[in-house]
Amino acid sequence: MKITAIEAVPLAIPLKPMTPPSPWTGGTRKQIYVLVHTDEGVTGLGEAFAYGAPLAVVSVIEESLAPLVVGLDPLAIEKVVDVMHRGTMIYGRRGLGMFAISGIEIALWDLLGKVRNAPVYELLGGALRPRLPAYASLLRYETPEAVAGACRHFVAQGFRMLKLHQTDVASVRAAREAVGPDVELMLDTNCPWTPYEAIAMARALEPYRLFWLEEPVWPPEDYAGLARVAAATETPIALGENESTLYGFNEIVRQRAGDVLQPSITKVGGISEFKKIAALAQ
């Protein structure tokens, strides 16, 4: 079996208005489907992260990566991935290049599953557990009252874990008062603070028993600063959404920069690299 073509399909999915209203609603969510076609008629489907620059990712996939892998055996996933990494070394180690590689790599696993007539999780060694809890990831709201209302809405739908996107103590207090002590709350702040500001905020938030505090420091790769935050608070620190490489995650672990690793499978190179990062956490 040989790869005959790589196709990148940009999507723009309209976002519905939400109640309560949020500055994050409206517009479209951009994403890219990646199709790996073969000479035997089997096609693999993957997904590439594309927030903010979808056409740039499409260009990397179709103009840079496709010429490298057309003609290769799609079932030799490690080989194809190695060719992509080496062929994009100068510009593809992070960001858009890694997003593009991720989409193709995920499509290769989908293709392998179709050839073997097995779900990908079985190809990876089987399920460790039959179910996982899901959390509701809330939008960012303009008032504590809106936060409380959104929390009550999702708890009524059955969620027992909620992730907030606020950057103030009052909103977290309102959320905790709205849901009571038995619902887990996480807080994703999207990298707003210096390490010193983050330490002060983390300590101020401790009474509300956050399950984790996510990405509290700018820039997100300031792992030394994040390590200071992690050492100064009882709240677990989550990070890694903006990291693109196994080696970056190794540095997070080495510096003890946080407690919860959050690799995005469409950002770090796909399923194979994701598994290696999970092994680091173990």
Stretches with model-predicted labels:
Residues M1-E40, G44-L45, F49-A50:
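Structured beta-strand/loop patches that form or line metal/cofactor-binding pockets in enzymes
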Residues I3, G41, L65, I104, ...:
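Conserved, mostly hydrophobic/aromatic
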Residues H37-V115:
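Metal- or metallocofactor-binding catalytic centers and their adjacent structured scaffolds
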Residues E40, Y91, V115-R140, A174-E184, ...:
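N-terminal small/glycine-rich loop or linker at the start of catalytic domains
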Residues I77, V120-L123, W212-P219:
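Flexible, glycine/charged-enriched surface loops at secondary-structure junctions
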Residues R131-A146, T189-P195, A238:
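Active-site mouth loops of central-metabolism enzymes
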Residues H153-L162:
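Catalytic domains of carbohydrate-active enzymes, especially glycoside hydrolases
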Residues L164, V169-Q282:
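Catalytic core of soluble alpha/beta enzymes
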